[in-house]
Amino acid sequence: MAQRREPDPPPPQRRILRTQTVGSLGEAMLDSEVVPSSLVEIAPILRVANEVEASNPRVAYLCRFYAFEKAHRLDPTSSGRGVRQFKTALLQRLERENETTLAGRQKSDAREMQSFYQHYYKKYIQALLNAADKADRAQLTKAYQTAAVLFEVLKAVNQTEDVEVADEILETHNKVEEKTQIYVPYNILPLDPDSQNQAIMRLPEIQAAVAALRNTRGLPWTAGHKKKLDEDILDWLQSMFGFQKDNVLNQREHLILLLANVHIRQFPKPDQQPKLDDRALTIVMKKLFRNYKKWCKYLGRKSSLWLPTIQQEVQQRKLLYMGLYLLIWGEAANLRFMPECLCYIYHHMAFELYGMLAGSVSPMTGEHVKPAYGGEDEAFLQKVVTPIYQTISKEAKRSRGGKSKHSVWRNYDDLNEYFWSIRCFRLGWPMRADADFFCQTAEELRLERSEIKSNSGDRWMGKVNFVEIRSFWHIFRSFDRLWSFYILCLQAMIVIAWNGSGELSAIFQGDVFLKVLSVFITAAILKLAQAVLDIALSWKARHSMSLYVKLRYVMKVGAAAVWVVVMAVTYAYSWKNASGFSQTIKNWFGGHSHNSPSLFIVAILIYLSPNMLSALLFLFPFIRRYLERSDYKIMMLMMWWSQPRLYIGRGMHESALSLFKYTMFWIVLLISKLAFSYYAEIKPLVGPTKDIMRIHISVYSWHEFFPHAKNNLGVVIALWSPVILVYFMDTQIWYAIVSTLVGGLNGAFRRLGEIRTLGMLRSRFQSIPGAFNDCLVPQDNSDDTKKKRFRATFSRKFDQLPSSKDKEAARFAQMWNKIISSFREEDLISDREMELLLVPYWSDPDLDLIRWPPFLLASKIPIALDMAKDSNGKDRELKKRLAVDSYMTCAVRECYASFKNLINYLVVGEREGQVINDIFSKIDEHIEKETLITELNLSALPDLYGQFVRLIEYLLENREEDKDQIVIVLLNMLELVTRDIMEEEVPSLLETAHNGSYVKYDVMTPLHQQRKYFSQLRFPVYSQTEAWKEKIKRLHLLLTVKESAMDVPSNLEARRRLTFFSNSLFMDMPPAPKIRNMLSFSVLTPYFSEDVLFSIFGLEQQNEDGVSILFYLQKIFPDEWTNFLERVKCGNEEELRAREDLEEELRLWASYRGQTLTKTVRGMMYYRKALELQAFLDMAKDEELLKGYKALELTSEEASKSGGSLWAQCQALADMKFTFVVSCQQYSIHKRSGDQRAKDILRLMTTYPSIRVAYIDEVEQTHKESYKGTEEKIYYSALVKAAPQTKPMDSSESVQTLDQLIYRIKLPGPAILGEGKPENQNHAIIFTRGEGLQTIDMNQDNYMEEAFKMRNLLQEFLEKHGGVRCPTILGLREHIFTGSVSSLAWFMSNQENSFVTIGQRVLASPLKVRFHYGHPDIFDRLFHLTRGGICKASKVINLSEDIFAGFNSTLREGNVTHHEYIQVGKGRDVGLNQISMFEAKIANGNGEQTLSRDLYRLGHRFDFFRMLSCYFTTIGFYFSTMLTVLTVYVFLYGRLYLVLSGLEEGLSSQRAFRNNKPLEAALASQSFVQIGFLMALPMMMEIGLERGFHNALIEFVLMQLQLASVFFTFQLGTKTHYYGRTLFHGGAEYRGTGRGFVVFHAKFAENYRFYSRSHFVKGIELMILLLVYQIFGQSYRGVVTYILITVSIWFMVVTWLFAPFLFNPSGFEWQKIVDDWTDWNKWIYNRGGIGVPPEKSWESWWEKELEHLRHSGVRGITLEIFLALRFFIFQYGLVYHLSTFKGKNQSFWVYGASWFVILFILLIVKGLGVGRRRFSTNFQLLFRIIKGLVFLTFVAILITFLALPLITIKDLFICMLAFMPTGWGMLLIAQACKPLIQQLGIWSSVRTLARGYEIVMGLLLFTPVAFLAWFPFVSEFQTRMLFNQAFSRGLQISRILGGQRKDRSSKNKE
């Protein structure tokens, strides 16, 4: 199945060019949306034509004709893209329609138009105006727009026919025109005068905000200003500063909603007069301007926010300031990523605003102050935004799509940080075009030498504050304190272990202590290295640095160098008997004087004094915060030396409690790690090292360059290197262990996993309603309810329902049932399960007890009956049994009470009523006295029960003809009660019952006089309410469900969701506010071009195995498919297919199970549904509450038209609190090309009317003046909603669905300059509303039950959580919903699940370093919109755009928290290639983060322990992963050196050398990381916590059986390769991983292309190393270490080589193998070249693989060459081991001779290559003879050498092992030096050699796979292993993979 199944796009509109049939052309043109972008103005006319066509085809024709004319006027030369085709098609249609429509028209077209226009006005507009209420504003708006278009056409037709327009029509048109101005499409608030009756406009808070904005008193308007109705201060700002009209409309609504929402929180009871509260204004203003004021303070400027002294004007002034900021922000486009640039613009414009209001006079002109950029239309966009935007755009072009080095272009951060320096004011206002900010680059300036001379100051600014240079040194530079700490600890440990006894106590011995103090010399050297690095890596930013910063860098180097000298000298002087280097230093400084250790100690104390100060500040974070924020010069001087002054990264320190928690975490971790390193790795290695250094080895196996070197340094390095690498890496292992323990404890204290199973849910269900009302229902603010809420819920059990609980029960029922109904709508449960899970909606006034959902009470009645029947009068026994099971008690009591009510309701007759009352009063008496069992005979109960069930069944049917049967049933019941059950009772009862039937016995009474019993019954029940139906149905369930409902719901997902939701109610969450008082929020989803809704074709299209998506889904979700069929009332699939109306239902069902936009939208719209229900529960009066929300929904249609109804109010509140914007970047492109995705998005908008779609509109504008008409693209940010649905006039045709433009804001140019996704979010963020902003990806999902908790979650923004600041990002947990697809998907979802739960829990608390990891986090919207938005967008460097939002938030004093009582669904990748692409993207992103300024600043501004947290949870994880792989390399190359040099043989007698415990410990650590231990630990803990440790153990074993270790080892290679490559060479890019279902087989060539460089090459290299070691190694045979090392590393090799084939579906199926081989051969031998994609030819792929070297720079290429040299070691070592030379000749000439052999072979290959080109066509025979001779010569020489014998078979193998790596090394060097090789003209030979190597590698990989494919059981085993997860869900995967072939063959036979 395709990785990313794009729906096949329907043909674009250009198909109209072709000659088509009349019908199809007509259909194509009917779509008024498929219009070229340059003719966008005619779309409304075509819409109207479609609308009126059914009622008057001639008018439709005239509209289209007018559209054609207008199109011709707009683009006379048809120069726009697609215009000529469009016009031609339209003309063809007009020619056809002219003839057909002429017949039915009136005398002339003018008359036709006039009469139709009047008809339309009367029929639609007047009818709507005359309606009882004019609430249907949307239809009115639509009608006015249509009328306006009709008049435009009418006027044109009249002009053509020279007819005057009638006065009556002109008068009508004037009315229409006036109203069209008022009735414009709106987003949320209709602000026109006629909309005051709309529910949302009636809210006092909205009225207050609107009134405040309309106060324009005292504003100086321009001279020619005409006053408009409802003018407000934003109109004034627009006229003064030249903002766009739609920007003003958008921000007006934004500001009103913002103020209204904050205002209502100040007044919880909104009865006051609508006057805006000053506190609300102050709160919003504080949030909006906190960053601006901080910026002014930082630069030492006074802010421009001057408030007037007159109190009455203060409010207006504040609103003006806020309005101005929002208008600037709303039009700033890409400048929104540069918050301080916006501050600069605002600073000047606000000052101008103040000047105008104060009436200031300009000292320059002597006139009143005016805005520098005037108030013409679009002045702000053209004159302020565009120049800065163009600078960004130019810089982005220089990045060449991210290929250039970061240091040669300025990214968003560089441009923004220009405004962090006081120099930014040189830019001036109006801004100087020649300012250095705008200045061109050095290259551009070289072209304009003359200008440079005249204005030498204006050179390219260069980078600002920081340079992102590709270098590993960034890891040391950003986290220098960490590396210094580890290096110094290592030195100290080695010194202690080396000297004295090796015990830690030895440190107290004088000499040892003094030696340990040498770490301070190392510290000084490291400081010097850091200072030098700082200068080297910041060199390219020197132009932007101030003198103070440059001075600091130089002084840092000077000071560090001085300290190195001082430390070294004083150390030398501290020794009495100095030796070695100490003596040398002493001699330099004339040192024969006595020793003085005290001098060294003094030096150390002085050196440490700054550190002591910082340690003191660390203990008191509040002092540190104060100092960093302070602007006092002395403070600034103090801080200047420790860290350069920077606008961000100040005052980030946490509270003392948080600091204590994470400090303790790290102290425990570091002590454990260092103790382990010392006792297991370093101390045991010292003894063997000393022994090795004592031995002298004189015999070598190769030519030794330094035969007399002392101490065997090579051996020591080979021994210590892996251990030291593991020392630096294993903190990651300790982090995994400690964080798992801490996370587990933390989770347990948060009460996670208290309800894990259905059994637990049942046992706790009694306390759920209480917890529900405590958590999800707003409480009164009385003191009692303020107490900790849920402590009481344990004890709270509702048996009886006191009257005060009526409302609580009703609220619980409404919400619970909404959740269960959503389960049913999602097909997670069947109808029967739904009935069992529902709680009665309607409270029954006759029952005074809680009515539990039937799934708790199922089968309780039959069991109770059996117990009662067999009780034999033992009352107490039965009572005991009932007391144990409270649900049984409830069931019995409810059934009895309902039975009583039912009989009393049915029976109307007086006499019967009396009898029944007597019976019930007797029974009640017995119940009260507790003598029921002893006094009554209950053995007849089952019979009575049977009769009662029959009665209920008749009542369910409710048919007239059953009345007689009911009478019989009632008589049977009466007889049973009086004769059997109550036989001992008073005889009068019997008398009453039986003697009353007939008056006399002896005489035949006439029929009409005979009186029947139960003749008067209320049956059938005519007034059947929903409540009555529900009651009867429930009673029927209680009585008839015999089997236990223990497994209800049976669906695993439904169980998981129910248990999680129930559990979350007992977790700590903020109390719920009323909907009206909650924080408002938006959801923003970026969408590019993924699937919106699966098409039927896409669902049924089969892959090569004959499997369609639909078939696959049916097999994976069998229960949900059955439930779906039940919901749509179909028995089977055939029935479903037969009904066309269900096609869309089927598409939706499938789309809800994929990763589609439809699924995401449905999930997010649950928020709205939840808000509407909660608003109802908040506002409903008791009577309405008890009637229920269902009753309200039933009347919603009519109610929505009246603004005052409860339904309308609920809708209004939901609108005010929640907005959902989907940013469909390419919507207009899709729409104009007729793409199915645009139609599907429109369908979504129609289904959910409150969705808004934002998109970037590209409009071509043609310039008519020029000869051919040049095109210019204009870009807009647009927002649309679904237009009200209108049927074409007088037609029965389907409803026409269209969108409606709300805002269209012009942009300065293309919006996408950097990374696509953040830019897409940024353009749409202006259309979001509210105080919270949730970012949701389009592969996410949400649930109804979680949506109810949203208002609680938003309250977290107002709590400090024991810290120093409120949260700015709320983290949420995610649930990965794609885990059931395959084993890989299961591993991936487990890994992701553990990260998004336990991982982030620990990051947030205690570590305080949680950032933002993808979505569904919720941002404090105002905080982030004033600080650069919700992500960063610079090309490549911000590849992981989301984490940078977290970095930015933290650096700007934000606070990120994590909350686990709410969850959001998320889809993940499900195939190995998809997963690897995802891992590659993340690793690339981490590589770029390593170079970034944000991480550097965090590393330097955090305190030491928080910095450790930051490192090990971001790039540290990837660097440690890389060290893990490096350890294996270093170990093996070290062994290679020992083995081939003969040193291992010489040392093999040393027992310590053989039993090397430290190496065992080190490599065991490496193996732990390799097999995924770091992943598995937190995974197991989280599963244990949430599903029980028993389950965790089972899952762990299952994962191992399904080769999880293979998967994790393989991913290790992916992470290492892409992280390393990004750091060395760059080349990071966004990789779209696809959202499809992967059960398709990946071809061998595809796997080879993807994994060749990342895994296969490295795997083969390690294999050769292991083979050499296996052949020549001596020392370890039979030792545990040997086995451990061999097994572990061979496991890695085999995994890296064969995992892609192991995890490839059908990877071992013989037919597939044969196809793969053919495909591979075709690919490898295909010629490349321009236009040949890498998938088609090896040559193209190979060239693309080398692309990263082109942009790598000198450093990268040098490193590549240096690393390639390692391949020459094999040849050097192995030639001396050939039998000819071994032990005989160690001359260097032997090695030289081996190079002659290689060169000889290469020359022959080259010669044959040249021969092929020269002779193969004309002299083919000659060429073949030469080839044959060469081959025979080679064979003859080989046979001679073997016969003599000069060489052996083993030697041949050794030669292969020696020469293969050499060739590869030469190839790597040639690739790195490609330009040089091309100049030499031997590039084609290099290519040939490379192809040869690829063929050999391909064969090596393919042969074992093909061999295994011979055995059929291998394929069977692989399928089992891959799809075990799916098996457990009843998925017959063999049928999926090999499936449906039978179906196909049978179809073929037919």
Curated annotation (Swiss-Prot):
Membrane topology field: Multi-pass membrane protein
Segments forming a coiled coil: none
Glycosylation (residues): N577
Compartments it resides in: Cell membrane
Annotated SMART domains: FKS1_dom1
Class of this enzyme: transferase
Spans within the Cytoplasmic topological domain: 1-481, 527-552, 621-655, 734-1511, 1582-1591, 1677-1682, 1777-1787, 1850-1851, 1916-1950
Catalyzed reactions per annotation: [(1->3)-beta-D-glucosyl](n) + UDP-alpha-D-glucose = [(1->3)-beta-D-glucosyl](n+1) + UDP + H(+)
Stated regulation of activity: May be regulated by ROP1 through the interaction with UGT1.
Molecular-function annotations in GO: 1,3-beta-D-glucan synthase activity
InterPro entries per UniProt: FKS1-like_dom1, Glyco_trans_48_dom, Vta1/CALS_N, Vta1/CALS_N_sf
Keywords assigned by UniProt, alphabetized: Cell membrane, Cell shape, Cell wall biogenesis/degradation, Glycoprotein, Glycosyltransferase, Membrane, Transferase, Transmembrane, Transmembrane helix
GO biological process: (1->3)-beta-D-glucan biosynthetic process; cell wall organization; regulation of cell shape
Extracellular face residues: 503-505, 574-599, 677-712, 1533-1560, 1613-1655, 1704-1755, 1809-1828, 1873-1894
Top-level taxonomic group: Eukaryota
Entry GO CC: 1,3-beta-D-glucan synthase complex; cell plate; plasma membrane; plasmodesma
EC numbers on record: 2.4.1.34
Function: Involved in callose synthesis at the forming cell plate during cytokinesis. Not required for callose formation after wounding or pathogen attack. During plant growth and development, callose is found as a transitory component of the cell plate in dividing cells, is a major component of pollen mother cell walls and pollen tubes, and is found as a structural component of plasmodesmatal canals.
Similarity section: Belongs to the glycosyltransferase 48 family.
Protein name: Callose synthase 1
Species: Arabidopsis thaliana (Mouse-ear cress)
GN (gene name): CALS1
